[in-house]
């Protein structure tokens, strides 16, 4: 016999989270004590030990952590903040409007019909919904699957639209590092062309401005052993496969990039990493500046 009893709806009780702005350099414990003068130190220590304090979006238990005025400190009085742990994606910074991550190589930024899940987007979507099922994540820009490094996601439609509708003015600087085959004749220089994408989704250069989109890449040699060189690359424009095409045009393809002429893949990956991301925060208008380490293999193979 069917059970006709009406089941009670499952109701979500949001976390009680409070933010305590940092106005001057101070240690975390001192800041929390000053922000909650009616609370005993033992209570604050429990919050820290139970992952209920987050600094820049990440749970923090170090009571003597040095804080700066740009830091975001939040306390969850309901339960612990989720500890984000994913070997292919690292959260570098988080606030109410944006998340900056370091993506590992081999991970899609966003899925498609064939591979909708196990992407940077899906991982972060599940993460933000853990705190509140109504939370959302929005992709603002992408990195190629085989490119590692820094990228930013929006947590609100307002942040997404402000970044995307004014991208060239909001993004102040993007710097990549790459290992290329051989050694460029000039230690530094600029590659300029117009990029075209054909019906097979292949991108290539043309000198005809009527056929493609302007792409400008500036490069500088950091170190070289003649066989491989480590380059720093700065983008004046952001086109699909821009760096890969321009290094091919320079006759020094990126190591591991067999699609654009590389002979070998000694690092067993595309040797391209988004190292620096500097932009204007879409809501606070504060300048945000993030840098990541050059992958170790990039350094060793070019010595």
Specify the residue positions occupied by each region the protein language model found.
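Short beta-strand or tight-loop elements
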Residues: 87, 135-136, 176, 187, ...
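N-terminal low-complexity/disordered regulatory or targeting extensions
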Residues: 200-202, 277
């Amino acid at each position: 016999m069917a059970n006709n009893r009406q089941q009670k709806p499952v109701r979500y009780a949001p976390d009680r989270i409070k933010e305590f702005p940092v106005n001057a350099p101070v240690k975390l414990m001192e800041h929390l004590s000053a922000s909650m003068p009616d609370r005993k130190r033992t209570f604050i220590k429990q919050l820290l030990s139970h992952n209920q304090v987050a600094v820049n979006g990440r749970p923090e238990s170090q009571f003597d952590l040095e804080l700066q005025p740009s830091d975001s400190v939040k306390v969850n009085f309901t339960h612990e903040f989720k500890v984000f742990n994913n070997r292919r994606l690292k959260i570098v910074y988080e606030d109410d409007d944006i998340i900056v991550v370091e993506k590992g190589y081999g991970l899609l930024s966003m899925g498609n019909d064939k591979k909708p899940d196990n992407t940077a987007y899906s991982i972060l979507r599940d993460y933000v919904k853990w705190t509140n099922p109504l939370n959302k994540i929005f992709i603002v820009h992408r990195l190629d699957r085989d490119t590692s490094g820094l990228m930013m996601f929006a947590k609100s439609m307002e942040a997404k639209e402000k970044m995307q509708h004014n991208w060239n003015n909001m993004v102040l600087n993007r710097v990549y590092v790459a290992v290329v085959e051989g050694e460029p004749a000039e230690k530094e220089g600029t590659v300029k062309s117009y990029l075209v994408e054909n019906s097979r989704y292949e991108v290539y250069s043309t000198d005809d401005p009527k056929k493609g989109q302007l792409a400008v890449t500036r490069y500088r040699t950091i170190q070289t052993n003649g066989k491989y060189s480590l380059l720093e690359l700065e983008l004046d424009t952001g086109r699909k496969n821009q760096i890969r095409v321009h290094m091919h045009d320079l006759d020094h393809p990126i190591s591991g990039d067999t699609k654009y002429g590389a002979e070998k893949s000694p690092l067993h990956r595309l040797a391209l990493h988004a190292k620096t991301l500097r932009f204007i925060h879409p809501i606070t208008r504060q300048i945000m500046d993030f840098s990541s380490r050059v992958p170790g293999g990039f350094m060793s193979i070019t010595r």
